[in-house]
């Protein structure tokens, strides 16, 4: 009996029903709730699992390199990045039959293959990889790192190598190590790689281990560094006629501030990127020497926080007590980490298309669309997770005595004001935006499009103008041709920036109008409503007017009966669950907007977006319906084309999504009856009755059914849109 799953909870292991399996899976990673867990074991388990995570990441990236080297066409793609389609890997069994084999044999391959829309080809090319041998070498190196990570994870679980709790709670040492050791040193190393390998590679010089020490990255070597003439490293940059990967039009500069894009590759100048990483390295190496460790110099985090008491008493005792609260709560730390990572991931989405760093990626439209959408969805999930762990912190780790009258306690004290203001903002945005859209819909329906309410986003246009966009005619700051900032920009800093901003072939500062104004506010509605649900869930996690003793019920309790006036949708878990729907909804609007605006930009018919995006029917008809037609014809009675796999995924995504509602809109008594009936029939059917359950089948709990429903809803939603996005973009632009 002792070996039954889950081993970490004897109580669950002895449960006679199928709850055992469900609750076992649900609490497998909740180390805090496991039998005989101690604080020390908790920290050690998490630390060891980080190495496991790293091992998986290294193995996965190694697999990407290996499969492209084995089954891809990297070497022929390098010869002509704009016209050869990059191959991700072979397809063993294309569906269905000979027409499918022919449809998927492309990119110069001998058999059926998948096209890569991840941007790895452009990335590897930009950083100096050129041959399949390079890819195999990289794959082997990452495989080696993966093995090292696994060994490190195992090692840190052995008695002799287990770190102590005091080691985990040494905030200053960890800060110094992460800032200097991880960010600083890795950025410096990356600058080194760019200067020694990638930039020579972009100029037609093949640098590898055999000639690495013979090739000078700059004609003057290290002399300018030691003599203080650093400006020499910026002189003679690549010319605007430079052909990437060749010496034609190449310069000798290694660290520049050109700004804008390389005319041929449409990506940022590699020498600008190297300069950026060097600056980041410098900042983080300095930052990583600021905190007090064994040497008695530098800042103490505790002293810093204790000293943060704003004058005038407006924030009470300021940051007093925060150090111990944060340092002793893993959930608080995880919440902060997830919030930061979520924002960073969304910024990656925004910057990968507006300031593309990889050669030729801007001309690979499907990849641009896929990467933007991918990073926005990931950001959404990570950000909602931040609030989930914030709520768990309030339930499990928050100590009111330790935080009396500090900023944290004051957040809880005036939560009603915070929640009601967020609620007001959401209602205002929702009703006004929908009102404008619906008004415009009605005007179109009655044949009077001139009666639409169209609002120019003048403030946003003014901000774009201030950064140098001249087409609006604002004549302000960088768009004012006779201003000092404009003239300085021509020579001193980023001379290519203003050209890039006003060039219409890239995605930097796209021209915006009434359609953008409306969808911007629709997205603002989604963001504010998601935030409202998440903030309310976290701030009410310990208790609310209706249920003041919520803390004693934990994070994910089900309804507490009708006694308090009904307590469904009131646990912190319920708030997270509802927020994820809003998050998906919001990211949907964000990606619809991005994709449609870019499709019309790439096709050269921006007026379609401008005219149709001001009313809902325009979005439904001219974006969704119009762009799904090719996809739905992936296979039809006449045969199969290369979009068939996406057509199938589109259908399958809808199926998974719809299945979610079976769990979301369900009455538990009915499910229990259904399960009992199925079990009864099973036990009385020949052959089927040879299989017996050890556990008595019972219906899912309310919380479980919501989780299963949410998982299906999310997966189906994302599968459906991914198929639509990739098929509609690749169908148009090859």
UniProtKB/Swiss-Prot annotation:
Matches recorded under InterPro entries: PSI_PsaA/B (IPR001280), PSI_PsaA/B_CS (IPR020586), PSI_PsaA/B_sf (IPR036408), PSI_PsaB (IPR006244)
Entry's localization field: Plastid, Chloroplast thylakoid membrane
Residues the record lists as binding chlorophyll a B1 = 654
The record gives the membrane topology as: Multi-pass membrane protein
| Pfam families per record | PsaA_PsaB
Cofactor remark: P700 is a chlorophyll a/chlorophyll a' dimer, A0 is one or more chlorophyll a, A1 is one or both phylloquinones and FX is a shared 4Fe-4S iron-sulfur center.
Q: Which UniProt keywords apply?
A: 4Fe-4S, Chlorophyll, Chloroplast, Chromophore, Electron transport, Iron, Iron-sulfur, Magnesium, Membrane, Metal-binding, Oxidoreductase, Photosynthesis, Photosystem I, Plastid, Thylakoid, Transmembrane, Transmembrane helix, Transport
Give TM segment ranges.
46-69, 135-158, 175-199, 273-291, 330-353, 369-395, 417-439, 517-535, 575-596, 643-665, 707-727
What Gene Ontology terms describe where this protein resides (cellular component)?
chloroplast thylakoid membrane; photosystem I
Q: Name one GO molecular function term.
A: 4 iron, 4 sulfur cluster binding
Sites binding [4Fe-4S] cluster sit at 559, 568
The residues that hold chlorophyll a B3 are 662, 670
Q: What is its main location?
A: plastid
PANTHER family named among the record's database cross-references:
OUTER MEMBRANE PROTEIN, OMPA-RELATED, PHOTOSYSTEM I P700 CHLOROPHYLL A APOPROTEIN A1-RELATED
Which family does the entry's similarity section mention? Belongs to the PsaA/PsaB family.
Subunit and partners: The PsaA/B heterodimer binds the P700 chlorophyll special pair and subsequent electron acceptors. PSI consists of a core antenna complex that captures photons, and an electron transfer chain that converts photonic excitation into a charge separation. The eukaryotic PSI reaction center is composed of at least 11 subunits.
What does this protein do, in the record's words? PsaA and PsaB bind P700, the primary electron donor of photosystem I (PSI), as well as the electron acceptors A0, A1 and FX. PSI is a plastocyanin-ferredoxin oxidoreductase, converting photonic excitation into a charge separation, which transfers an electron from the donor P700 chlorophyll pair to the spectroscopically characterized acceptors A0, A1, FX, FA and FB in turn. Oxidized P700 is reduced on the lumenal side of the thylakoid membrane by plastocyanin.
**Protein name, entry field:** Photosystem I P700 chlorophyll a apoprotein A2
Q: Which organism is it from?
A: Calycanthus floridus var. glaucus
Taxonomy-wise, where does this protein's organism fall, top ranks first? Answer: Eukaryota, Viridiplantae, Streptophyta, Embryophyta, Tracheophyta
